[in-house]
């Protein structure tokens, strides 16, 4: 388990982010950057934990990302538009948050130096409708361009390419 690190978790107040924070917070300093749109953290006592700092903001704001990342050795980038209903109603925003948000995180990490590890969360959706027993090396498969539900998968696949290159 990771210990003694300062860790930025973008989207850290969401369902998975708050669960990850619960696992890391006892032995690390955790900075959460989140717009609190889906505030799963509110059902926990994390906000009161002395090792948690909440930066309320958006990954689309590069200066906020830079401020939140200051001094962090590890960055876990989870921020994205969540929920099929939200993605289908806001496909452009879904792409914007994924692509520009990830670019901001990657550029800030590169410019500040000292980042030991950057983890970019993706989704099994990049493997298509039947993502069963797939591995990261398997070919991706996306649906038809006209199907709005694939916006999320396309945006996450693009962020994978950004993070790996």
Where are these regions (language model features)?
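Catalytic helix-loop patch of NAD(P)-dependent Rossmann-fold dehydrogenases
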Residues: 89-104, 116-117, 126-165
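Conserved mid-core alpha-helix of short-chain dehydrogenase/reductase
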Residues: 64, 104-108
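A short helix->loop->beta-strand "cap" motif at the edges of active sites that frequently abuts
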Residues: 109-117
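Active-site beta-alpha loop architecture of Rossmann-like, nucleotide-cofactor-dependent enzymes
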Residues: 39, 81-85, 125
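N-terminal Rossmann/SDR dinucleotide-binding element
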Residues: 1-74
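Small-residue (primarily alanine) positions within well-ordered alpha-helices
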Residues: 12, 79-80, 109, 159
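NAD(P)H-binding glycine-rich loop region in Rossmannoid oxidoreductase-like domains
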Residues: 59-97
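SDR active-site strand-loop-helix element
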Residues: 10, 33, 75-78, 118-124
